[in-house]
From Swiss-Prot:
Originating organism: Danio rerio (Zebrafish)
InterPro entries linked: Yos1
Protein purpose: Regulator of endoplasmic reticulum secretion that acts as a key determinant of brain size. Required for secretion of extracellular matrix proteins. Required for correct brain development by depositing sufficient extracellular matrix proteins for tissue integrity and the proliferation of neural progenitors. Acts as a regulator of the unfolded protein response (UPR).
The entry's keywords: Endoplasmic reticulum, Membrane, Protein transport, Transmembrane, Transmembrane helix, Transport
Subcellular location: Endoplasmic reticulum membrane
Gene Ontology biological process terms from the UniProt entry: brain development; endoplasmic reticulum to Golgi vesicle-mediated transport; organ growth; positive regulation of extracellular matrix constituent secretion; positive regulation of protein secretion; protein transport
The protein's name in its UniProt record: Immediate early response 3-interacting protein 1
Membrane topology: Multi-pass membrane protein
Transmembrane portions of the chain: 2-22, 62-82
Organism lineage string: Eukaryota, Metazoa, Chordata, Craniata, Vertebrata
One Pfam family it belongs to: Yos1
Family: Belongs to the YOS1 family.
Length: 82
């Protein structure tokens, strides 16, 4: 497989899909990354764990509908052009 722009875009889509399907109660809480784990005090700098949890929640919230459209376009392109 050649290293193309389409391959990079497809990699980003797959990575975003992987983040979007992570379920907080079924998966993240089992490894200690549940909702109550990343709470910090006011004025405290959030740690890397809290920032990653916020990123995961944001991706799941904001990218749910656009991912459906992007995945559909990607599937159609793969069907048409192989």
């Amino acid at each position: 497989m050649a290293f193309t722009l389409y391959a990079l875009i497809q990699t980003a889509i797959l990575f975003t899909n992987a983040i979007a399907v992570l379920h907080e109660e079924r998966f993240l809480s089992k490894i200690g990354w549940g909702a109550e784990q990343g709470v910090g005090g006011f004025g405290d700098d959030p740690g890397i764990k809290a920032q990653l949890l916020n990123l995961i929640r944001s991706v799941r919230t904001v990218m749910r509908v656009p991912l459906i459209a992007v995945n559909s376009v990607c599937i159609v392109l793969l069907l048409l052009f192989g």
